[in-house]
């Protein structure tokens, strides 16, 4: 094994004790990788480095990048919205990272007809998936609604049938999270045929600050339910970019350069160039300021 590879393996194990690379893993040739997958990986990592809880890992960016290039399967094109799955694969490869993103959601339902009261087991997830078309539709119907209220409406419409012991009627579900994550992640699902105008209308709905307590019923101190957008993974053609908030302005990371965007209105405007935000990372405001 090359001495430099040994040093990288040892460095990874120091950073995350759960990580281990065997000699075979480290020496396995990468082969021909899919350019879009490699682009997506780079921009997911770039977005993550902009989150404060990962600040201590930034100096090891190249180590993590090299490890994931070898560990993940990046030889085949991503499927539609497949960047979400790649993000989950990263968290699976680096399990300690997942602790910052995980959300345990509890669903409660009281049937309006038979009054059967049900509480479902907590489900673990790492992101909230929202359809881009649903954002546009709800915004069109409720023009004064904020981003978080629009998400609340979308989630409320996800009804569940009354249990087999009840009447079977579809009922609204109250959703609660028992532990606030350090990073609240939203994944936007797109089709491949949105017009530039539809992309613009979708991004216009987004906000840079959200209160998770509007979307869910949250246990604990409500002072910790406010989150601020710090970075986004975006798709532009067949390449991924990272849009991040740095030094009081928004910038866009391309393959080998940084484009200064400016304020949030400018971020929305550049999406007329068919730039689709796909993963949004919101960091807890209180934790970020501490």
Pin down the residues of each PLM region.
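Papain-like cysteine protease catalytic cores
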Residues: 2, 8-24, 33-133
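Exposed substrate/partner-binding surface patches
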Residues: 2-20, 128-290
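Generic detector of short alpha-helix boundary/capping microenvironments
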Residues: 24-27, 83, 98-103, 150, ...
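Generic hydrophobic/packing signal
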Residues: 25-28, 35, 43, 61, ...
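Conserved, well-structured core segments
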Residues: 27-30, 34-43, 109-112, 184-185, ...
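Processing junctions and N-termini across compartments
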Residues: 30, 105-108, 154-161
